[in-house]
């Protein structure tokens, strides 16, 4: 069985789209629609990887990433965002993101990013 992925995005449409891409490739997907739910699901589900939107209502992606790092310094996170600013990419990497993927994501792009990050830990 492939890895378990926690998918965090406040857009139900974005979650559904990425979920379908990942599940079609054999990944198990757990969803969270906001930062607090993401932290709870991470603690309960122990996913191998987190796909994290940067801009969300309430707690933003960088805040979620910081809290995840406190919970688990080895957490693997791919930031998935429509924010194409180079500074956003730098902030995400500086906060500990393993990769950064720009929305809208394509199936090959997201699967490659997930496989690359998971390969590093296997």
Which sequence ranges carry the predicted segments?
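Charged docking surfaces used in two-component/phosphorelay signaling
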Residues: 16-24, 90
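Short hydrophobic/Thr-rich beta-strand motif most characteristic of the beta2 strand and flanking loop
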Residues: 26-33, 41
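Acidic catalytic/metal-coordinating carboxylates
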Residues: 34-37, 60-63
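The short loop immediately C-terminal to the conserved phospho-acceptor aspartate in CheY-like receiver
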Residues: 50, 54-55
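The feature encodes the CheY-like receiver
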Residues: 57-58, 85
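Alpha4 helix (beta4-alpha4-beta5 surface) of REC/receiver domains from two-component response regulators
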Residues: 63, 84-99, 112
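C-terminal output helix
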Residues: 105-114
